[in-house]
Amino acid sequence: ASGEELFKSKPCGACHSVQAKLVGPALKDVAAKNAGVDGAADVLAGHIKNGSTGVWGAMPMPPNPVTEEEAKTLAEWVLTLK
């Protein structure tokens, strides 16, 4: 599945949209923050799969039911967004 398909089929949309901040940051802002950062896709994939805290403020991101491969596909897709 493509990153966009995974975004739509997983619970991502409950907290994120591409263009606007919801509970979590807009995905275009995640892409902008990580533009040109070495290893950004791997770090982001880890956040998608395992969750994270304190990256975008107080709201934690929960772990998500995705495989390593799905997390990587999602991360790579997010990083292409503008």
UniProtKB/Swiss-Prot annotation:
Name this protein carries in UniProt: Cytochrome c-551
Keyword field contains rRNA-binding: no
Disulfide-bonded cysteines: none
Pfam families to which the protein is assigned, alphabetical: Cytochrom_C (PF00034)
Gene Ontology molecular function: any one: iron ion binding
Record keywords: Electron transport, Heme, Iron, Metal-binding, Transport
Binding annotation for heme c: 12, 15-16, 61
PTM description: Binds 1 heme c group covalently per subunit.
PROSITE patterns: CYTC
InterPro entries for the chain: Cyt_c-like_dom (IPR009056), Cyt_c-like_dom_sf (IPR036909), Cyt_c_ID (IPR002324)
Function field: This is a prokaryotic monoheme cytochrome, unreactive with mitochondrial cytochrome C oxidase or reductase. It functions in nitrite and nitrate respiration in Pseudomonas, but it is also found in other bacteria.
